[in-house]
From Swiss-Prot:
Family membership noted in the UniProt record: Belongs to the class-I aminoacyl-tRNA synthetase family. Glutamate--tRNA ligase type 1 subfamily.
Cellular compartment(s): Cytoplasm
GO biological process: glutamyl-tRNA aminoacylation
EC category name: ligase
Name of protein: Glutamate--tRNA ligase
PROSITE patterns xrefs: AA_TRNA_LIGASE_I (PS00178)
Lineage: Bacteria, Bacillati, Bacillota, Bacilli, Lactobacillales
Superkingdom of the source species: Bacteria
Gene name, Swiss-Prot/TrEMBL: gltX
Disulfide feature: none
Length: 500
């Protein structure tokens, strides 16, 4: 195996959108392939027809491309080892099913689900781990054939099970976990390799595919560790060499310390959800790659090229990776600060249009206004959808201050500062950020009020917020009429509250 060309695969099931955990698996395989100048194969594992979702494969492909992952072989681009959808490989699997049946390494099993469940219940009652018990124990070849013929005559459809040899140790050197081993009597007995509908099971099909596609390394989540001894059993039955395995640690929710579960609604877990919020693909690539893999040095922001250069599976963590939403927000903010402003404009415009704040086809003047709005908030946002809440003041009618804002203004010499600032603004013909800041300085000279006691009342009175972007830029975008209305309404409210 050491001399073979690196060939890895990402093999999702088309059961829904791209999950963070699956995206990490895809990224690690991508980086491993590119670092070693190897080949990445995309394979769609769609044999579980009951769970397949229409459009699921296309959704996976689209979101992988969005993340910046490409592959060398797959259902969309072809290759020398296809087909790349398991549903199109049934004849291939059948060939090896037949081989194992002929060699006596597999057999037809007619036990019904009801019989199997009754068997499991009995085992649980006895304190025994549920496992399949060979149904033809003590029978001759002729007796087995007769029993199977009788079952077929009753209309029963069989599964095919593979014989698990007794007293065998299945072991491998895992490139993440180290040496692992399982005894053959701990894996649940002879397991199904072909279902009643003729489709292969996962643990059989994956072995056939990985061998025929010459996969050299299998990097996947550690929830697959229990599958590995079953797959090694199939490799041995067919006389094939197994690939190198590496099982990545699970991802936990940093807030709860529990495994990241699709049922956990406290954190968004699908790539498409982050796309809708306006996260950048480069930021998602960066953040997800650091979930369970440590680069050299202290830096936390890397380009794709730097990741490819550094990636070494030996640096994959043996401890669970913590998914921290605040950390993801920070990473995305770092990328937004240097992102192409046209890209941010497109994302933020989509968010504003989804919220009904900007029309579908804005006029050039309105587009320029939106561009200025996005540029103003770019460094402040963790993701572009935040602009909907941050910029509400620009899309709403003048309103009264909140009780909290009134209490804040009470601390300062608010009224004289606001009144003088209103006078200074009234003189302006050109309502630009520079002129507005000049008006604030003039207010300072006229009133003697300075620092926070000057700026906070003016900010609250004009923008209805105690924090925000540059106050001059904000007021320029709001427009003089709106700002003057806010000032008038603020002074009226202060009078009503008896604040002079």
């Amino acid at each position: 195996m050491a001399n073979k060309k690196i060939r890895v695969r990402y093999a999702p099931s088309p059961t829904g959108h791209l999950h963070i955990g699956n995206a990490r698996t895809a990224l690690f395989n991508y980086l491993f392939a590119r670092h070693n100048k190897g080949t990445l194969v995309l394979r769609i594992e769609d044999t579980d027809t009951a769970r397949n979702v229409e459009g699921g494969a296309e959704s996976q492909i689209e979101n992988l491309h969005w993340l910046g992952i490409d592959w060398d072989e797959g259902p969309d681009i072809g290759g020398d080892y296809g087909p790349y959808k398991q549903s199109e490989r049934k004849d291939i699997y059948q060939k090896y099913i037949d081989q194992l049946l002929e060699e006596g390494k597999a057999y037809y099993s007619f036990k019904t689900e009801e019989e199997l469940e009754a068997q499991r219940e009995e085992q649980r009652a006895m304190g025994i781990a549920p496992h399949y018990v060979y149904e033809y124990e003590g029978m001759t070849t002729d007796e087995i054939k007769q029993a199977q013929d009788e079952a077929r005559a009753k209309g029963l459809k069989p599964v095919v099970r593979i014989h698990i040899p007794e007293g065998v140790t299945y072991e491998w050197d895992d490139i993440v976990k180290g040496h692992l081993s399982f005894e053959s009597d701990t894996i649940g007995g002879d397991f199904v390799i072909q279902k009643r509908d003729g489709m292969p099971t996962y643990n059989f099909a994956v072995v056939i595919d990985d061998h025929l596609m010459e996969i050299s390394h299998v990097l996947r989540g550690d929830d697959h560790i229990s599958n590995t001894p079953k797959q090694l059993c199939v490799y041995e039955a067919l006389g094939w060499e197994a690939p190198v395995f590496g099982h990545m640690t699970l991802i936990i929710n940093s807030a709860t310390g529990k495994k990241l579960s699709k049922r956990d609604e406290s954190v968004l877990q699908f790539i498409e959800q982050y796309r809708e919020l306006g996260f950048l693909p480069e930021a998602m690539f960066n953040f997800i790659t650091l979930l369970g893999w440590s680069p050299v040095g202290e830096s936390e922001i890397f380009s794709k090229r730097e990741f490819i250069k550094q990636f070494d599976p030996a640096r994959l963590s043996k401890s669970p990776a913590a998914f921290d939403q605040k950390k993801l927000d920070w990473v995305n903010n770092q990328y937004m600060k240097t992102a192409d402003r046209d890209e941010l404009l497109d994302l933020a415009l989509h968010n504003l249009q989804e919220a009904g704040l900007v029309e579908a086809n804005p006029a050039p003047g309105k587009m320029e206004w939106v561009r200025q709005l996005v540029n103003m908030y770019a460094n402040q946002m963790s993701y572009t959808k935040q602009i909907v809440d941050l910029s509400k003041i620009f899309f709403t009618e003048a309103k009264y201050l909140t009780d909290e804002e009134v209490e804040e203004i009470k601390k300062d010499e608010a009224r004289p500062a606001i009144e003088e600032f209103k006078k200074q603004l009234d003189k302006l013909d050109n309502f630009t950020a520079k002129k507005i800041m000049d008006a604030i300085m003039a207010t300072r000279r006229e009133t003697g009020i300075k620092g926070r006691k000057l700026f906070m009342p003016i900010r609250i009175a004009t923008t209805r917020s105690m924090v925000g972007p540059g106050i001059g830029e904000a007021m320029e975008l709001m427009g003089k009429d709106t700002v003057m209305k806010h000032l008038d309404l603020t002074l009226k409210q202060l009078s009503e509250a008896g604040i002079e």
